[in-house]
């Protein structure tokens, strides 16, 4: 274990990627950290209110940040251009918020996406959780109530095209480990509903 840098701020569950010898990361404020020199540089802020637990993908010198949530869950996204130091809204939307989804980037433009919150259920929960006593009721509900995504699908980052590769109620997870080994795909634990974690490790063979 090696400490690469000490920062006077904290960032949790935002966007990030490695590009060349640098780490680019942020939540609302954006930063670029040089792994060789230790230099930290402020970059252009995320253009709207910060979002947590979205999907970050590096494609053609741009970081795509999809979905995520704050006081509501989103299906749109923004891309950051490293050369121009600016953000632009992405032309397409993903099928659901991808809040808490797991991903595997197969190649430059194709990403596997597993699980993720249901946008409508999340947005309603933000309202309902303001009511006294509802929190206990919310966390006691069964997983069927939350309607998390049961699909594994392939997203083309370039044009937003979606190909559904599989559907199973056991895929309805958030925060799962998702690993590709040869032609096998391993799904490791993850939450099956808020506050409850699945114990299983699933093996999906020859998904593509």
Where are the regions a protein language model picked out?
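Kelch-like beta-propeller repeat domains
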Residues: 1-208
């Amino acid at each position: 274990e090696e400490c690469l840098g000490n920062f006077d701020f904290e960032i949790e569950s935002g966007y990030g990627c490695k590009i060349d010898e640098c780490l680019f990361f942020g939540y609302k404020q954006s930063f670029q950290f040089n792994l060789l020199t230790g230099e930290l540089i402020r970059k252009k802020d995320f253009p709207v209110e910060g979002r947590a637990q979205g999907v970050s993908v590096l494609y053609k010198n741009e970081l795509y940040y999809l979905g995520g949530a704050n006081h509501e869950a989103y299906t749109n996204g923004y891309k950051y251009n490293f050369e121009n130091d600016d953000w632009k809204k992405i032309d397409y939307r993903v099928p659901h918020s991808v809040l808490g989804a797991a991903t595997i980037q197969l190649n430059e433009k194709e990403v596997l996406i597993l699980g993720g919150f249901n946008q409508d259920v999340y947005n309603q929960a933000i309202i309902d959780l303001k009511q006294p006593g509802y929190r206990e009721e919310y966390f006691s509900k069964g997983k069927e109530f939350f309607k998390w995504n049961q699909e594994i699908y392939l997203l083309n980052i370039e044009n937003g095209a979606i190909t559904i590769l599989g559907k199973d109620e056991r895929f309805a997870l958030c925060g799962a480990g998702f690993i590709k080994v040869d032609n096998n795909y391993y799904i490791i634990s993850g939450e099956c509903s808020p506050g409850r974690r699945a114990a299983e490790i699933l093996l999906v063979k020859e998904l593509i």
